[in-house]
Amino acid sequence: MAGAITDQLRRYLHGRRRAAAHMGSDYDGLIADLEDFVLGGGKRLRPLFAYWGWHAVASREPDPDVLLLFSALELLHAWALVHDDLIDRSATRRGRPTAQLRYAALHRDRDWRGSPDQFGMSAAILLGDLAQVWADDIVSKVCQSALAPDAQRRVHRVWADIRNEVLGGQYLDIVAEASAAESIESAMNVATLKTACYTVSRPLQLGTAAAADRSDVAAIFEHFGADLGVAFQLRDDVLGVFGDPAVTGKPSGDDLKSGKRTVLVAEAVELADRSDPLAAKLLRTSIGTRLTDAQVRELRTVIEAVGARAAAESRIAALTQRALATLASAPINATAKAGLSELAMMAANRSA
């Protein structure tokens, strides 16, 4: 199914690129960059959750227009990633320089006027905006052409929730960084809004909304998705500190350098306060500063030594098991349960 989602994206993006040919080669280059970013990587998790949300309440396969609707989640994800890299000043994404760095390099290579860095940031903002606008266009088009009025209203409600929660979660994330928030509760709230809702809960509900009026199933997916989505984010937190850059495509320790207030970091500070005041001081004074590779390794050692990594793994396991227990009792068909169980294990235990 991931391949079918990619095919839908490819056809849509190629069509939009052809339709915009009259706008000239520079804009064509921006669209080509979006094509490359969307088609060149990603696990298609969000459209896959939408697909199984559909199958939870419908026995028939979704038609191509509905698959295109689910594919819009991948464009929304591209928007979030490009802008997240800007906010975090990240250098790499999926093993390549981030959009803002590539556009800054383009500016330098062509010896243009002004600041390469400012151009890079501006172009990356527009790249992300393009992904968001086209995601919205897909939803509007499919609702008008392929869904009954009641289904249209249900889908639009879920889509509005997705966008609001992603933006709200992202803002809370930067507030947490700026204020050096330390509580696990604060970090969990960010993880729920910024990641869990738009990665699992809302995609599942989008699929269900397109297929049928099943508020009972949507409510169950709210709980299932909250637990699994936070487990997904906690895995991301662990990979951000301990992951293999050759596999994740991002430098290990980026979250520590940017000062991201993840659950892993909050857990480390809380545990260090109890057992090792010197370690707690090191964490508080180092995270969010210009760290050398040696300092990243030292912080990684401290985080593991105080038990934060083990605590994160325990949380991931507990949340995943709770999500699977919720799924087991859900009034949905067995095929969807099996598909979602497999997808859940992959999401929580991935290495990239």
UniProtKB/Swiss-Prot annotation:
Annotated residues for binding of Mg(2+) 2: D84, D88
Q: Where is this motif: DDXXD motif?
A: 84-88, 236-240
Keywords, sorted A to Z: Lipid biosynthesis, Lipid metabolism, Magnesium, Metal-binding, Transferase
Which EC numbers does the record give? Answer: 2.5.1.10, 2.5.1.1
Catalytic activity as recorded in UniProt: isopentenyl diphosphate + dimethylallyl diphosphate = (2E)-geranyl diphosphate + diphosphate; isopentenyl diphosphate + (2E)-geranyl diphosphate = (2E,6E)-farnesyl diphosphate + diphosphate
Q: Which pathway does the UniProt entry assign to this protein?
A: Isoprenoid biosynthesis; geranyl diphosphate biosynthesis; geranyl diphosphate from dimethylallyl diphosphate and isopentenyl diphosphate: step 1/1; Isoprenoid biosynthesis; farnesyl diphosphate biosynthesis; farnesyl diphosphate from geranyl diphosphate and isopentenyl diphosphate
* Cofactor note text: Binds 2 Mg(2+) ions per subunit.
Gene Ontology BP terms: geranyl diphosphate biosynthetic process; isoprenoid biosynthetic process
The record's listing under InterPro entries reads: FPP_synthase, Isoprenoid_synthase_dom_sf, Polyprenyl_synt, Polyprenyl_synt_CS
CDD domains documented for this protein: Trans_IPPS_HT
Q: What Pfam families does the record tag this protein with?
A: polyprenyl_synt (PF00348)
Please list the residues that bind Mg(2+) 1: D84, D88
List, in alphabetical order, the Gene Ontology terms for molecular function in this entry.
(2E,6E)-farnesyl diphosphate synthase activity; dimethylallyltranstransferase activity; metal ion binding; prenyltransferase activity
Recorded superkingdom: Bacteria
What cofactors does the UniProt entry give for this protein? Mg(2+)
What does the entry list as the binding residues for isopentenyl diphosphate?
K43, R46, H77, R94
Instruction: Give the comment on domains.
Output: Contains two aspartate-rich DDxxD motifs, designated as FARM (the first aspartate-rich motif) and SARM (the second aspartate-rich motif).
This chain's function reads: Catalyzes the sequential condensations of isopentenyl pyrophosphate (IPP) with dimethylallyl diphosphate (DMAPP) to yield geranyl diphosphate (GPP) and with GPP to yield (2E,6E)-farnesyl diphosphate (E,E-FPP).
Entry similarity comment: Belongs to the FPP/GGPP synthase family.
Name of the molecule in the record: (2E,6E)-farnesyl diphosphate synthase
Q: Can you name the source organism?
A: Mycobacterium tuberculosis (strain ATCC 25618 / H37Rv)
